[in-house]
Amino acid sequence: MLALLFAATSYAADTIKLGGMFPLSGRASDLGITCKQGAELAVKEINSKGGVLGRKLELLSADDKANVQEGVTLSKRYIQKDGVNFLFGVVSSAGSLAVAEVAKQEKVIFMDTVASTDTLTKEKWNRYTFRAGTCNSQEANSLALYAAKNKKLAKFYNIGPDYEYGRTMWELFKAKTKEQNPKAQFIGEQWPKLFIPDYTSYINAILQAKPDAVFCSLWGGDLVAFIKQAKPYGVFDKMKWIIATGGDVTVAKALGKEMPVGLIVDQRYYFHWPNSKRNQEFVKAYMADFKDYPSAWAAEGYDGVYFLAEAIKKAGSLDTDKVIAALEGLTLELPRGKATLRKEDHQLSSDFMVGETVFDKAYPFAIVGKAEVFPAAKVLYSVDEWKKAQAANK
């Protein structure tokens, strides 16, 4: 049965094993599949140059279905039956917290890639968990600062998924918006469950509330379904929309010409940002292997593998304590630009982009235009804030 759960390239027994967990089915599958592909590309590149410490990397992959218990079960199987050296991946924020707890108990390093709750590297921090991707504070704060430039936006409404990610994003967005505009009002909120089929009641509630702007943290297939259902009601013309991860290329491709123009959106990485040689090389290699533009999730999977590989090389060993020490403060030049795993909290520190949806004749889908880049120091929670959170949890 176990052989049916895991897919991996066949290597010798002395490979360095990464136990990958990704949603490979259902509405979250675009995130999981492309994250897995990005990780596979990194493994291929590193192995083509001899691997690490003379050993090949091996990525095991399993469908965690974006389910918390599934992630816990897979993590334990990977460690106890497959003998993985690292846990890797995860899209669901709730799932990442559960996997991090397994990593802590088993004393195995977990490299989170997509799941972005601040709680993972802040209130529930543990020394075995690192994040190679963006966290909620970077995302929500950047969106709030970008939206604050529009002085006509005073009344805000929320629609977000009813779990850790959605609720945290709304609280962070409100706090930063209130800081920028003390007169801002937050007039309502809606919390649909993940993966529901019908958003009609939520759309009608938004129309009745008549906000100036809606903050939306639906993502992946849920965001695609919501936009398709909401567009006939004219909601995207009647109010401004601020959509976290709305610049996701997998969402843009799924919607095609149905994507509304002028949405304020973010993306943790974009295939034409930054315009660097490193990013251009990544896009070229990814498109050669997968015949598609890389998503942010692909970049986060790719980055996570490179962080682990460089740390193992730096440590000169697979000893957990030595690899942790090598990961702490590690800085790499990645497709997203220069990025550092902060020593204190193990959170990735890198620049962040927000813009608006536009159409460009060069692409068959909407892209992110009118972009503004926010330095990590301006939007990521500070080390002092992290220390206060740690003290409060003792």
Task: Cite the ranges covered by each PLM segment.
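Extracytoplasmic "Venus flytrap"
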Residues: 16-38, 62-69, 91-94, 159-167, ...
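Periplasmic-binding protein-like
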Residues: 78-91, 111-113, 157-160, 210-220, ...
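An alpha-beta-alpha
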Residues: 128-190, 213, 308
